[in-house]
Amino acid sequence: RGQKVNHKKVQRIMKELGLKCLVRMKKYKSYKGAVGEIASNILDRQFTAEAPNEKWTTDISEFKLFGEKLYLSPVLDMFNGEIITYTIGSRPTFSLVSDMLEKALERLPEDHKLLMHSDQGWHYQMKQYRHALKARGVVQSMSRKGNCHDNSVMENFFGIMKSEFLYLKEFESVEQFKEELEKYMNYYNTKRIKAKLKMSPVQYRTQFTQAA
């Protein structure tokens, strides 16, 4: 039978042997039944937006490296595909999502009408999460149970991230993975040309803002 070893020891041994680690990514199943309040699917697969900060969506993805799990919680603007912010942690706690939401709402202009979409994960059903949205006048929307296509925008982002970032790199440590992830998020927002926009998400938002 295998022995459980601390991920830092695994990192040290792999470094001594000159080995690097590939990352595995999979969908995190956060649905635990009706633990709070489930919102209607107001978004209804209307994934386009006329302006920034009209429709945001969020989800959680799970990574595995050096025998340890990491959880990523990003929020994406459907107007231009920009990642507004993200949090990453070793456990899928409520604070992973609440910290993400707090950071995201700091970027939302006052009295701005926003629709925030997610799946029916337990984090998004919690009273604290719903109250944080309500306090800023944000309307909550949820996918139908077990229907990933209702949040395909976020699924598409995770797919791009897999092919462009995770499967092309090897990592020496969890810390290096986090550093490279931050670089990739910046690249994705500011440099990567989105075919539909013919420019990067930030360039598209900047152009729209200047023209308005």
What are these regions (language model features)?
Residues 1-51, 147, 202-209:
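Basic, flexible linker segments flanking DNA-binding modules
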Residues 2-3, 47-49, 65-66, 120, ...:
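Conserved, non-catalytic sequence blocks in retroelement Pol enzymes and Pol-derived host proteins
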Residues 10, 14, 21, 43, ...:
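Mobile genetic element proteins and their domesticated derivatives, centered on retroelements
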Residues 45, 49-84, 90-91:
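An active-site-proximal beta-strand-loop segment
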Residues 64, 87-109:
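Active-site beta-loop-alpha junctions of metal-dependent nucleic acid enzymes
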Residues 110-126, 144, 148, 199-201:
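Acidic/histidine-rich, metal-coordinating catalytic segments
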